[in-house]
């Protein structure tokens, strides 16, 4: 079930290079906000980029930042410092709202 309101379907889809996750993108010259939803269990491989802040809306997120793993549940927030290597595991049905420092982190489909 999608936790976001139906009007969010009008927000552009984000082009994500990972199978099993979809998202909606709101972008500005100063950063991006992406509303992610894991359709199935998803493993995000290690990577790095500009700063990121997020909140778990539904489900569970296991986030590993600089080798330290932490599990987040609905209502909990997380922050990834700029340049920090990180990876993630999202359970099926997990929804996140992520704010990215980089204004060009993702592109719309």
Place the predicted regions along the sequence by residue.
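Glycine- and acidic-residue-biased ligand/ion/polar-headgroup-sensing regions
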Residues: 49-62, 66
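Short acidic-glycine-tyrosine-enriched beta hairpin
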Residues: 67-82
């Amino acid at each position: 079930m999608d936790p976001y309101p139906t009007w969010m379907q009008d927000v552009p889809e984000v082009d994500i290079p990972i199978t099993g996750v979809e998202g909606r993108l709101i972008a500005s010259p100063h950063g991006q906000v992406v509303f992610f939803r894991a359709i199935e269990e998803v493993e995000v491989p290690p990577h790095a980029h500009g700063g990121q802040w997020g909140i778990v809306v539904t489900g569970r997120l296991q986030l590993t930042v600089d080798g330290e793993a932490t599990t987040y549940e609905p209502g909990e927030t997380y922050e990834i410092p700029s340049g920090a290597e990180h990876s993630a595991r999202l359970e099926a049905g997990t929804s996140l709202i992520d704010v990215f420092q980089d204004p060009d982190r993702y592109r719309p489909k």
